[in-house]
Amino acid sequence: LQRRILRKVSDKSIATSRIVPVYPGGADPGDRPWFEYPVCVYPHHTDYAGVVWHGSYIQWMEEARVEYFRSMGVDFAQLVAIGCDLPVVDLSVRYQKPLQLGMRAILKTRLAEITGVRQIIQCQICSLDGHERYMTAQVTLVAVDRQRGKVLRKLPSMLVDALMTLS
């Protein structure tokens, strides 16, 4: 994967320079541990046939992403309070096997790449025993100034500090 070199500057913001293959923490994302978020399929998650509706997967991915960031010390309410939002700007989902009413599974998520203010998150939903894979996805977030609606030039320091813990 190609991405910009990240370097920590004195005010703990991230600046970008030339493009080279680098990963947060210096390791390939395949080596990074997954954050695990349990899901249970309730009636409101399903369509008329008892199969999980495609939008439920997206909602679960957002819940898992918020909890993943919280586990690193970043509370979304704090990001909002300082005027930052992390909207989804790209989403790719591959549904591999349907989840059905009453099933339980694990949604795994991890940071795969950072380029400037853009973060790419990998997700997958697997059976509790890990033998079945139901869905894989990639979500791209961008840091935005909530008031102006413009992409930020650098990540907020609280987010930078959390991402540095991945190294």
Tell where the protein language model's regions lie, with residue ranges:
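Hydrophobic residues in beta-strands and at strand termini
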Residues: V39-P43, Y95, A143
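Residues that recognize and position ribonucleotide moieties
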Residues: F35, G50-V51, C84-L86, E132
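Catalytic strand-loop segment that frames the active site of acyl-thioester-processing enzymes
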Residues: D11-S71
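HotDog/MaoC-like acyl-thioester-processing domains
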Residues: R4-P33, Y37, Q100-R104, A112-S167
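Hydrophobic beta-strand-centered segment that forms part of the acyl-chain substrate-binding groove
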Residues: Y68-Q119, M135, V142
